[in-house]
From Swiss-Prot:
Keyword Repeat: no
Known partners and oligomeric status: Part of a complex composed of FtsB, FtsL and FtsQ.
Protein name: Cell division protein FtsB
Gene label: ftsB
GO biological process assignments: FtsZ-dependent cytokinesis
Any Gene Ontology CC annotation: plasma membrane
Organism encoding this protein: Cronobacter sakazakii (strain ATCC BAA-894)
Ranges in the topological domain labelled Cytoplasmic: 1-3
Family matches, as InterPro entries: Cell_div_FtsB (IPR023081), FtsL/DivIC (IPR007060)
Length: 103
């Protein structure tokens, strides 16, 4: 009975060592689970970006309004007879308040 107990105890120690420190053990599992979570977050961001790009492609393929909007915003194009006005914010508002005079 003593040899069987010793053999079972040795087997238990070996199994515990393999579980905690061996290949595909608890540490590897937690590391891979963290890697999977990071990859899923990255994939979700890229999927949202792809969906946005596909929607933009559909808009551009669908009609002239999207093309016209892009031409107006990115190239500052206007229709004949229109006047283009660019509104520039006041320099004092951009700097965070009125300019102070140091005397």
């Amino acid at each position: 009975m003593g040899k069987l107990t010793l053999l079972l105890l040795a087997l238990l120690v070996w199994l515990q060592y393999s579980l905690w420190f061996g290949k595909n053990g608890i540490h590897d599992y937690s590391r891979v689970a963290d890697d999977v979570a990071v990859q899923q977050a990255t994939n979700a961001k890229l999927k949202a970006r792809n969906d946005q790009l596909f929607a933009e492609i559909d808009d551009l393929n669908g009609g002239q309004e999207a093309i016209e909007e892009r031409a107006r915003n990115e190239l500052s194009m206007t229709k004949p007879g229109e006047t283009f006005y660019r509104l520039v914010p006041d320099a004092t508002k951009r700097a965070g308040g009125p300019a102070q005079n140091n005397r």
